[in-house]
A protein has these predicted regions:
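Short phosphate-binding/catalytic loops that engage adenosine nucleotides
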Residues: 32, 80, 182
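A cross-kingdom marker for long, charged
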Residues: 191, 195-218
Length: 226
């Protein structure tokens, strides 16, 4: 999972466009198939019989404006599918985020899938401590449901995959997400996805600009999706 992009490393979550391009080239040269995340989920739940091996999926969380300015040109150049996990409260509101029009524009490429990251990216552990059990339950429902509804309304896409903010999840959150209509969800637990992994807590590697050369090789080495 990536977050932000740019010509230089602006913060701990920024990967330079040069570094991202080197990642894509490494994958190409190594024979890795970059597949839509949906294919991985469908395989995991038995709706798809096979995947290319080795393969992986690329995801980007949050909806930072650098996805539009810096990442999208590379997505088009290399024709790679990417899943964006968005929290709608920021879109067209926060100065760091993309706009709905920008999302619709890049959507026409057919290379991007838009999925949910809650409504405003809360820390569920903190909210649980602050709120009464009833208020917390209502808060969770709002975060999961409102995000799904807003994304589907604005982008006309089916939203049934979820990225847990800060990688925080538990059985109660999973139960509520399934109730609302999510069929899979993703963490930031650093290991390769296995058939035995729970579909509502599938792992992902958090990628930073430090993941270059041998470090990036360690992330992807020996990662067949079957």
């Amino acid at each position: 999972v990536y977050h932000r992009f740019g010509p230089v490393v602006a913060d701990g979550m920024t990967v330079t466009t040069r570094q991202f391009e080197s990642h894509v080239k490494y994958l190409r040269e190594g024979g890795y198939a970059v597949i839509p995340l949906r294919h991985l989920v469908d395989y995991h739940i038995g709706k798809r019989k096979a995947l290319p091996s080795p393969c992986l999926a690329i995801t980007v969380d949050d909806g930072h404006k650098s996805v539009y300015t810096d990442l999208f040109p590379l997505i088009k150049k290399y024709k790679i599918p990417v899943t964006l996990f968005l929290y709608p409260s920021a879109i067209s509101n926060a100065s760091y985020a993309m706009t709905w029009d920008q999302l619709r524009e890049i959507q026409t490429s057919g290379l991007l899938d838009f999925q949910g990251h809650t409504y405003w990216h809360p820390n569920f552990k903190h909210e649980r401590k602050k709120l009464s059990p009833r208020d917390y339950e209502n808060f969770v429902e709002m975060q999961l449901k409102k995000s799904k509804e807003k994304l589907e309304k604005e982008l006309g896409t089916k939203v049934d995959m979820l990225s847990w903010p800060f990688g925080i999840y538990d059985e109660e959150l999973i139960r509520k997400a399934v109730e609302i209509g999510y069929v899979s969800a993703f963490t930031i637990e650093r290991h390769h996805a296995k058939p035995s992994d729970p579909v509502m807590a599938l792992p992902r590697y958090l990628i930073t600009d430090a993941d270059q050369g041998k470090a990036f090789e360690k992330v992807v080495r020996g990662s067949p999706c079957s």
